[in-house]
Regions:
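Hydrophobic beta-strand-centered segment that forms part of the acyl-chain substrate-binding groove
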Residues: 67-118
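Catalytic strand-loop segment that frames the active site of acyl-thioester-processing enzymes
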Residues: 16-53
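RNA-interacting cores
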Residues: 2-9, 36-38, 48-52, 146, ...
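Mixed-charge, glycine-accented linear interaction segment located at domain edges/termini
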Residues: 124-168
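Intrinsic-disorder/low-complexity, polar/charged segments enriched in Ser/Thr/Lys/Arg/Asp/Glu/Gln
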Residues: 19, 31-33, 116-118, 130-132, ...
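Short aromatic-glycine motifs in intrinsically disordered, low-complexity regions
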Residues: 5-15, 87-91
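Hydrophobic beta-sheet segments that form the core/acyl-binding groove
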Residues: 24, 100-140
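Compact, glycine-rich, soluble single-domain proteins
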Residues: 48-68
Length: 168
């Protein structure tokens, strides 16, 4: 089964032009590497005033993290028999990028790079609710952006329920 753009779109929340990754190059339980050429596209949805700033590479890395979560969840030993709510705790629910830290931008923009982007993420630690990744994005062996990201896998966990009914 090729882990191409079509597969990626079926397994992450972003569709159409907002799906920024073209293929998974490699992955295992701890890390992933993905390729993309969408930074050169004039209709890239992250472009502003005709430019794609380097900070947008964080979104490329975040999508790689989402793909990694989907792959890990799908490869779990009981993935086909585990309930959706339990499977969600190992990566198949929608995750939310909660924070990024120690971000280093080594270039000003991405759209002027001729070579494809490589987005890589490595799981540092995590549990059923949050995951900490180290990420990097580079092009033609040139580092572009790196940092750490916290991903919340179940954003509703631990929040009080909200009563939306009317008051008398």
């Amino acid at each position: 089964m090729p882990l191409d753009r079509q597969w990626i779109e079926q397994h992450i929340p972003h569709k159409g032009r907002m799906c920024l990754l073209d293929e998974v190059l490699s992955w295992d339980a701890a890390r992933i590497r993905c390729r993309s050429a969408t930074h050169r596209s004039a209709d890239n949805p992250l472009r502003l005033h005709g430019r794609l700033g380097a900070a947008c590479a964080i979104e490329y890395a975040a999508q790689a993290m989402a793909v990694h979560g989907a792959l890990v969840a799908a490869s779990a030993p009981l993935a086909s028999t585990v309930s959706t709510s339990v499977r969600g705790s190992i990566g198949s629910t929608v995750g939310y990028l909660a924070s990024v830290r120690n971000v280093s931008l080594h270039v000003a923009r991405l759209d002027d790079l001729e070579a494809d982007l490589i987005a890589a993420a490595e799981r540092v630690t995590g549990d059923g609710r949050t995951v900490l990744y180290e990420f990097s994005v580079w092009s033609a062996q040139q580092p572009l952006v790196s940092g750490r990201a916290s991903v919340v896998l179940d954003a509703t966990f631990g929040l009080p329920s909200v009563n939306t009914g009317t008051h008398a």
